[in-house]
């Protein structure tokens, strides 16, 4: 994960890294900390310390890290981040998550309306959209389109694919599952 993330970033094959002005990292492992240090040679990096336990002290530390990150972003972009903007961003992201969850729900049907790889292409593709407010509507429209095509896929074993990250390499896993008679449902 670390090696491929770093490689994609420094070779400009990762659109997230390519289009970013700053990388926000976290301290989940020593390998990632080193990766962020090396990425700092290419772009500004801010690393957030994650608390090791869920405690009052850990929550205090996490709140301080969030505030520090906000201050770094405000200075870098010369823009004061208001509480109103944060609330709005939360609403936008929650609407996107809700629409994606609703889209995934169609894969619960006895007769599936689409292949898992098609579903993955839809949702993965939307991660590259810069108009975050439009995403929920796009997902809803895609869901309606899929359901209107009236496909009835049956007789396949349903497979749930999880992990971190669910990125480009996941496509190969889904293809393997579906080329061997299964179907990735989420």
Predicted segment positions?
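Trp/Phe/Arg-rich N-terminal binding region typifying the photolyase-homology
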Residues: 1-83
